[in-house]
Amino acid sequence: MRKVIIYILTLLALLAAGCGSEQPQPKELQLCSSMGTKLTEVIADSYSKAAGVKVNISYLPGGTQQERLDYLRKHKFDVWLGGTSEEYFMADEQHILQLYIAKESYKVPAELRNRTGQWTSLYLSYIALLSNKNNLHAYGLYAPETWDELLAPQLKDELAIADFDLGGASFGMITSIWQMRGKEQAMAYAAKLNAQQPVYTKGFGEAVDLVYIGKKTVAIVPLDYALQMEARHRHLFATVVKDANRTMLTGAAIMRSAAHPDQARAFLDYLMSDAGVELLPANGYHYMWHVKKYPYNDGRRELIGNVRVPVDDLSWTSVYKSEIIRQWRGAL
């Protein structure tokens, strides 16, 4: 009997020692970003410090929309940060997202949020034209503010546009003109723009570079980026497109394959919190507006003025994106 008691006590001691040696697993978040490196790191570092979570960052590679979605499907990410409304719409259609409504999403105007929780809208911008002032002066032109002004004879072979397949401001040009003017007038405009022989780049950064060095005169870019470039370089000038613009939304979504869903939800809640709202302006991003502050941002209203912005039909702009681009490129 004594041996049995000793055996039991020894076993209990070993079990207790084993339990005591177990260390809590560090909190982690696997983040895939479509944003630039610097901005992604600002967001990730801020959340990491606030929540005590290690954020592992990957970046979504280039390619077609389907190639990018396939990449997200094949890898086990918790959150996809920086996608566009069209991209999230298609990702949800292909069942690679999981639903979550961030705690303070109700404070966002209805037209700027996904009310069923497939993704969380975070930031908004508009379409801008970034011009090289030296080139404009040489051509005797004012900085363009409308799409029709890009048809000036002096601007033939002087336009830089990111490839439409990448979405963003360049694809927004197509959909805004199409929705505001109707298909017939949009195709007529597309034919005239195609005759201007714009150069198509692999990203809006490359388009900006061409304008910066003076090889091209005007680039179509997001407003927040255009304003940053204008502030840094005296020979660049940003204008908001007045006649057919677009509210360009970027956000975040939780992946269906998330290994850390609790951390993913906490991350989205943080980005929608007051701390998340102030994060970008506190780090110098003054022209990328948070959707939660949209109704109160007088600076945004003063900056964009009276622009005409359609309400996007995502079931059209997303599902038929390839066909829309094909027709635009083929307009003669």
Task: Specify the residue positions occupied by each region the protein language model found.
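Extracytoplasmic ligand-binding site segments that recognize negatively charged/polar headgroups
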Residues: 34-38, 75-215
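A ligand-binding cleft/hinge motif common to bilobed small-molecule-binding domains
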Residues: 86-91, 212-213, 217-235
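A bilobed periplasmic-binding-protein/Venus flytrap-type ligand-binding module shared by bacterial periplasmic
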Residues: 130-135, 248-260, 279-280
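Mature extracytoplasmic/periplasmic domains
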Residues: 255-312
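Early extracytoplasmic/lumenal segment of secretory-pathway proteins
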Residues: 20-90
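Hydrophobic residues within well-ordered alpha-helices
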Residues: 69-72, 211-212, 254
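C-terminal motif of bacterial Sec signal peptides marking the signal peptidase cleavage site
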Residues: 15-18
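Extracellular/periplasmic bilobal clamshell ligand-binding domains
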Residues: 298-332
